Every structure is written in structure tokens, then in C-alpha cells.
């Protein structure tokens, strides 16, 4: 095996994953014909498209195609609960909480593996150590992407912002956007460049 695969958990391929229509869940939490829904869907489709292109370019990774598509479309399902008016979200939680809030929604809907993608996609993932050191307003637990599918979606998400929906970031701009999360995040991002690009 190549060294880059060392210590990677392939559990999402090994477990029985319950599949679904992501739009049934989106419909439940995001009313039709709202800017909030439009922002969510356009961004999520861009992330899903990028993830699927990388998945197709790397058949040797044997990623779970339907899971990647579904989870990429739902990775930001929790944004409506946050206070982020620039993207039409008028909830009460800080934006950084959208990952674990989305995970709570998907667990309640019966999709625990999809929930982990929500919880683990913020930045390049959040370690418990970083959460505590930076006093981030999220639960104190590891929130690092583990499976290759989780890593792929987290990586694809770094190329798109919800404030510039029609623009894909360059690798350098995507890298800069996660620099605020620390050296560990940059190191993960660089590993993903080698693995997925």
C-alpha cells in the first residue's frame, strides 16, 4: 500500500450505509423559493460536483459514490440555525457550530454516517485540542474527518464559499481559507492535495 493510505479508516465503505434522497431532507428544513435555500443548494451542488470529479479521477480509492453525492449535498444542512445574515441565516448559533448542528439533524433523521460528514467538515476538521485551545463554541470532542469519503467532501468544500457562489477557489486560495485553523489543518489540506488532485 502507498504510504499516504496509512492509518486511513475505510469504515464508510465497510459499513452498511442507509441511502436517501437528500432533497427530502433539504425540503424539510429549507422552504422553497427562499434565498437561504438557493444559497445552500447552489453551494452544495458545487461541492458535490467537485467531490464527484475527484472521485472519478481516483477509482483506485474505491469510494462510495452514492454516499459521497448524498453527504456532499447535506454537509451544510445546519446553517439555518446560525447567525450568518450575509448568507440569509438568522438563527442564534455562531456559524462555526453549523457542522455539529447539521449532524444533530441528520442523526435525528436516521443517517448517522451522513451526520459525521456534517460534524467533521469545518475547516480541515477540528481536533479536540484545537477546539479547547481556541475556545470554539462547539462540543468538546474530535471533529476530524476520518473516512476517505469524509476527507474528500471536507476537501471539496474548501474550494467554494457561500458568499461567492459562482466562483471556484484556486488551490492556493482554498489553502489560505483554512490557514486560520492552524498548521495541523494546513498539513491535512496538503495531504488531501496529494491524495485527491
Protein language model regions, located:
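Amphipathic alpha-helical segments within well-ordered protein domains
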Residues: 27, 48, 52-55, 102-107, ...
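Active-site hotspot residues in diverse enzymes, especially metal/ion-binding acidic/histidine motifs
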Residues: 19-26, 53, 57, 171
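Short, small-residue-biased leader/transition segments that mark boundaries at the very start
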Residues: 1-2
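Divalent metal-dependent catalytic cores for phosphoryl transfer on phosphate-bearing substrates
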Residues: 31, 60-167, 171
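Charged phosphate-binding loop/patch that engages nucleotide di/tri-phosphates or the phosphate backbone
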Residues: 180-197
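Active-site flanking loop/helix segments enriched in acidic
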Residues: 21-43, 81-91
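Cationic, low-complexity basic patches in intrinsically disordered or flexible, solvent-exposed regions
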Residues: 15
Amino acid at each position: 500500500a502507498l504510504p499516504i493510505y496509512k492509518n486511513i479508516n475505510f469504515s464508510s465503505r465497510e459499513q452498511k450505509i442507509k441511502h436517501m434522497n437528500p432533497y427530502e431532507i433539504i425540503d424539510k428544513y429549507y422552504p422553497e423559493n427562499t434565498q437561504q435555500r438557493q444559497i445552500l443548494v447552489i453551494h452544495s451542488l458545487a461541492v458535490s460536483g467537485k467531490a464527484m470529479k475527484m472521485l472519478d479521477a481516483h477509482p483506485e480509492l474505491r469510494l462510495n459514490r452514492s454516499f459521497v453525492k448524498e453527504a456532499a449535498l447535506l454537509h451544510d444542512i445546519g446553517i439555518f440555525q446560525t447567525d450568518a445574515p450575509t448568507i440569509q441565516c438568522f438563527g442564534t448559533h455562531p456559524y462555526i457550530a453549523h457542522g455539529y448542528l447539521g449532524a444533530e439533524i441528520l442523526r435525528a433523521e436516521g443517517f448517522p454516517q451522513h451526520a459525521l460528514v456534517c460534524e467533521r467538515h469545518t475547516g480541515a476538521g477540528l481536533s479536540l485540542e484545537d477546539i479547547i485551545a481556541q475556545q470554539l463554541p462547539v462540543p468538546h470532542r474530535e471533529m476530524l474527518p476520518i473516512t476517505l469519503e469524509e476527507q474528500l467532501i471536507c476537501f471539496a468544500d474548501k474550494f467554494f464559499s457561500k458568499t461567492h457562489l459562482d466562483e471556484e477557489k484556486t488551490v492556493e486560495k482554498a489553502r489560505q481559507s483554512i490557514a486560520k485553523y492552524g498548521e495541523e489543518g494546513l498539513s491535512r489540506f496538503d495531504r488531501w492535495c496529494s491524495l485527491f488532485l
